[in-house]
Amino acid sequence: IGKQKEPISGERVQSMLYNHMQERSAVADALLPSRNVGIVWNGAGALPYSTWAVGVFNDWLDADEDIDESATQYIGRLTWAPLRTDDDSSLLHLGIGYRYSNAKGGFRFRTEPEFNQAPAYVDTGFDVPTGILPANNIQTVNAEISWRRGPLWLASEYTQTAVDNPDLSHPTFNGYWIGASWVLTGEMRPYSKKSGTFRGVPVAKSVYQGGKGAWELSARWSSIDLSDGTVEGGDMDIASLGVSWWLSPIFSINMNYRYIWNTRLGVEGSSSGFNSRLLLLLE
């Protein structure tokens, strides 16, 4: 109970500190809210390595409104790892999530090009005075798949959001990402069968113990389309490359390069950027 992550999307549920790239994908930031005020129930499924989670949320606290004036969301997620070796060194993960919102207060979907301090490149409300568009309800479906074999990890997610508003021609927005990472030093991302998520790269021997730490190479392609019906929010594709060096389990140096293709109202453009980050975990 409280302000917490909504149970949808493995990328959203797991800590961003353990993502293979510095920032979450554009589609996750645009269509899948991070934290909300609500109640979540979760547990192990009937099958081995399966989980379930359901939640009810209402953002009245952040919006400073009465509960009956703010949007209410009903959310659920199911995961299962149907294929795995006895030692879990090879594992296939599947997940599906659903989100329903009564959309009180309307909607606005937007996101930056996977650089936290950049402006929004796609935005459903950029040409609306208030930025907010009305809707009767909003339904979102998310599908996830991941495969890990030793130090190799491949993953992908697809998200689709349907808006019920005949005046906007019932627009549907969608996006996906495909990612991969390879831990050069041989460590393997652990899998949590309790939450149905992958955790961060462990460090076999830190540099402070005379080791090399853990080195990870990563790549991702992401795409989002916020133009449909009468809404022209634009579309964006992003290619990303990254390298991370975990000197110890709590300290890392990582660098990401991204190339972005962006189209809105028939105007096409491209840009690129490089970002470095020092990460220190304090517990």
Could you say what each language-model-derived stretch is?
Residues 3, 90, 98, 108-283:
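Outer-membrane beta-barrel pore domains
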Residues 1-104, 173-209, 216-229:
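Outer membrane beta-barrel
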